[in-house]
Every structure is written in structure tokens, then in C-alpha cells.
Amino acid sequence: MGHGSSVLLITSSTERSPSEEQVIVGAGFYGLDVQHFLAQDKKDNLQCLYAPNWKVITAIVITAEALPFVESKEVLLDGLKGNYRDVPVLITGVTPEIEANNLSDASKGYVVGSKTIVDCSSDALCKISDERAITKQLAGQELPCKAIRKHYLIVGDKKNADVVMEFKTEGTDERFPVFVKVNIDGRAVFFQAEMKVSENYARSTSRYHRNRFFEIAGPLMFLRYACGERCWHSVGHYANLTIDDPWLTEPYGNLSYKGLLKEMEKANFHTTIAFIPWNYNRSQAEVVSLFRSNPERFSISIHGNNHDHYEFYKYRTEPGDRWPAKPLNVQEANVRQALGRMEQFKRLTGIDYDRVMVFPHGIAPAKTLRVLKEYNFLATVNAGNTPLLAGKPPDSTDHLRQVTLEFENFPSLNRWTPGKARIDVLIDLFLGNPILFYAHQEFFGSDIGAFNEIADMVNESEPEVQWKSLGDIARHLYLKRLREDGNYDVLAFAGDLILENKHSREVTYFIEKPESFSPSIRYVTVDDELSPYDRAENKLILRVTVSAKQSRRVLIEYKNQLFADSVDVSKSNMRVGVLRWLSDFRDMHVSTNRLGRAFGSFYYQSGLFKRGL
């Protein structure tokens, strides 16, 4: 996929530093090539800028250790005229060991040195400025910061330097700049102090959860500021609330569909019911009518099949395992029966459903994800996107996304309880991740409007967020970036995507989807018409042109032997029937009083549900 954008990274050592690693991870996240130049002699400075085989440079990063080998006037000014005159520059990894005159020379006196904070709490905060053009959804926020050493920048001209990030400690008014933007002859130049959690930077950068996100926040902000639409970016901000287990009866325990609809209209959010297929023929007409009349507020996805405990557990168990084994062929049979039942549900109610699997109790092993792919599911969404028994993906960029294709080339997404911290929501919005919440009916025990506060927080944090069904979110689960020719590259996650051209001109999308071609592809269609595609290594490639202000649907259909009409959808298993009755009794009667709700809260929070109903 040729996009023609790259980051010029100038270093002075062959050993990768923490700051260099963070830039490389950030570039990988945004789909930018890194053109590395080793500066060990001032005479070689300019040859990297004019090499004919280099792509268009959209950002320049210089490690502070390389400054002695870089003539700042030559690199930042004279050497970057023409195509590179306005390219933003980041000087990163600044520590007290960097000579002050090198910093002062490179910054024209804006940054004159660095020091280490003395007596700074290990739980200090990293305050982010309100400069939304740089900080986006993180504007004005405070990130947890647990660095082993906290270096900061000495700013010489405080009036004309924009402090983007600074350390602060509780109980004091002191501020320590760590990420600064200055303007040098019309060019944006950023300076960042070294940021790391541990001496082992490889381990430190393997996961950027919120306690470590401050490490990479600066490079990510810089790269997106410098490269703009040439970075991989999502096509919108999406959010969803999923409620697990209910069938369509009014009320279902503490969940009143009529009441919830009023709250959704008031607070502006969308609810997906993770529907147990066993309940396919139990829906009440009143609730069915409510769903059919309000598709912008209600939707249905698939929640297992029978929901008999950990329904998609290990294929083989060992002594001490909590649940019985569920061999792969049994799990595939459950997937087939779930689809057969959902097709019956669709015929009986006239309500469509999304082929998005929410596994009961926990995500299945990886090979089951291949089964979902074979039966043309869009994605799976669970509290954790790593399959049972699988290790975390080694790629650092995977830890910045809530979706991974690492397992069977099938999209697996994270979701969170409503207790997810606001800063975590903001980080996901900044990264372009969908905001997916889930709850059970007892969440509404005290108030049917219990979710409104969370919805308000998300809507206020990102006014352009769209609350959609899990299916709609999956169909918009792709990244795009601007090409040199004005068209777009697309990195697809799901096998069903909606391309929306919001421009006033025709746009061609060059689509790549990581693909193992197992299971085999039956066909690819664009707006229901067969479309040719290419195979290149482990990728499916196709090109789609979309007229101005129009959209087109791309669908990849995989081969399988499913004939929904021939699937046995009967409820002949007495054990499952008893279990479902007991579960309904728990949800619809026990949980509707204070004592029952207290038990229900303990039931889920303690993990007792993994042992019982």
C-alpha cells in the first residue's frame, strides 16, 4: 500500500532509546514509515533529505543525543526549504545530560536546558494544555504519571513557548514543562523531555495503559499534528451500550424497555441487547413493536446460544478447571444453532440482528473465532479481546487499539463496564477507538436513567460521537489515510464495511484487509455486485471508487455449509431449559427488591456468576 508519507528520524546511536522507541511505536500506530538517519558526522546531514528513493517527509524527529551532530540552522532552516520548509520537528529524549547550548541553539533560546525534579511524588500527574489543535480530546486533562525519573525542560522564553504537557504534584502550585511547542521562523518545533516508566524501556512500551500513556502521548500528538490525514485515522467516533441476557419482555427485571427508550432520547445513546438465541420464540408483541419503531435506539446482537455457563470454554480441560470441556465441534454446533435460532427470531419478529458475538462469561479460544469468521460474523465483543488461553499480541500498536486481528484475522474488540474512568474514555477517543460499554439488568435497579450520566460524559467529551449498534460500528471499523494523489488507503478489520465519501469529489479507496484466506472466500461484492480482488501475501486487496457525497458497501462472504432452515432450533435439552428458567427467576424476580439487588451486585462483582447461573 503506497501512501508516500514518512517520518525522518535522526539519531546518533545504533542502540534504540526509549524516546526513539516511542516515536517508532507512534509511527506504526499511524501507519507512517520511519526513514532512519544515523547522524555521526555533521558532513552527512543533508544527504538524507535529498535521496531520490525517500518518500515525502511529513515529520522530522531528532533525538536530543543527536543534536551535537546536527547543525540546527542547516537542518531546521536552510536544509529544509522547499518541500520541507513547513514540516514540523520534534526534538525528543531531552535529559539533564544534554548540553544546554545545543538545546538553546536548536530552539533559538526558547528551551535552554533540562533538570530532574527533586522530591516529586511517584504519583504525580501530567497536565495537558487546552490547545485542542494538538491535544484533541485530551485537552485540559490530567494523566497518571509514574515515571522512575521525572525530567523537565527549562524554558527560556515562557511568553512565546506553548507548554503542551507539564508535570504537577498534588498540594503544590509548581509546574514542570515536559512537552513544549515553539515557533522558529514559521516552523513548529516541539521539545520533549525523556519519558519512561522503567529502566527496561522494551517492557515499558509493550503496553500503554493509562498509567503509562503519558510516555507516548507527546509523540502521538506530534505525529498527528504534523501528518494530519496522512495518519491512519478512524472514520468517526462511535459508542454503544450493550445489555447482556434480556429477552423481549416488559419489564425484564429492572430493565424497562419503555423507560429506557425515554432515557436514550433524553441522554442520546443507543442500546444493543446481547440476545440469547434460546429465547428466539418468547418475544412480547409490545416490545417487538418498540424495537421495530426505534432502530436508531435499539438493536440486537448474539449472546452465545443456550448461555449455559461458560458456553465456549476450553476444548480440553485439566484437573481443577471450573467448567467442563467444550470441544471445537460442539462450539461450532452451538454457533450454527445460534444462527438458526436468530433467523427464526427475525422471521417471528421482523427485527433484524447483527452477527456480532458476545460470548457468555468470557471469550472463547482462538479457533472458535475462525468459526465465527467462517459463518460470516462481523466481530466479537467481550470484556477482553484476547482469546481464552492466548497470549497478548506482541505488537505495541495492538495495545493502543481496542480491536485486534491478531487471532484468525477476525476482529475482536474490548468492552467495558460503566465504571470505566473518564480519562480512559478520553484516551480511547483520542486514539479513535470505539467506546463500548456493557451492563446487566440489575444496573438499572436504582434508576432506569442510571446510564445517562455516562452517556452525557461521552457526548460532552466528543460532541461528534455517534451512538450506533454493534453491527454499524463493526461496518465502520476501518482506518483510512490520505494518499499523495488525493485518494485514500483503507485498512479494513471486518469483512463488511461501508465506505462513505463525504467529499465533493469522486474518491478511490485502495482497500487492504489482513487475510489468511482460511476459511476460503466465496465472493466479494460491492453494492451487491461481484467485484474482483487481488491476493498479496496475507492480504486481500481491492479498489473501490465512490462518487461525491455517496457511500458503497463492500462485503466479503466466506464459504460455509450453513443452511439456516435445516438447523435444529428445538429446545430439547432439559438441563438448559431448567437453567434458563432459574436465570429468568433470578433476573426478573429476585433482583427487583433491595435485598435481591444487593445479592445480584455481589453475584457479578465477586465472580460468583462463573460458578452458578
Question: What residue ranges belong to the model's regions?
Answer:
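A glycine-centered loop/beta-turn motif at secondary-structure junctions
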Residues: 4-7, 26-29, 56-57, 120, ...
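Helical hinge/lid and interdomain linker segments adjacent to catalytic or ligand-binding clefts
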Residues: 12, 16-98
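C-terminal domain-boundary segment and adjacent tail
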Residues: 34-36, 218-220, 224-235, 262-279, ...
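A glycine-rich, often tryptophan-bearing local segment used as a flexible ligand/cofactor-contacting loop or short
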Residues: 67-139
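Metal-dependent polysaccharide deacetylase catalytic core of the NodB/CE4 family, i.e.
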Residues: 84-85, 91-105, 109-118, 270-369, ...
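C-terminal beta-sandwich/jelly-roll accessory domains of carbohydrate-active enzymes
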Residues: 117, 470-473, 480-613
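Active-site beta->alpha N-cap acidic-glycine motif
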Residues: 206-299, 354
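Catalytic grooves of carbohydrate-active enzymes
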Residues: 226-255, 264, 329-333, 344-358, ...
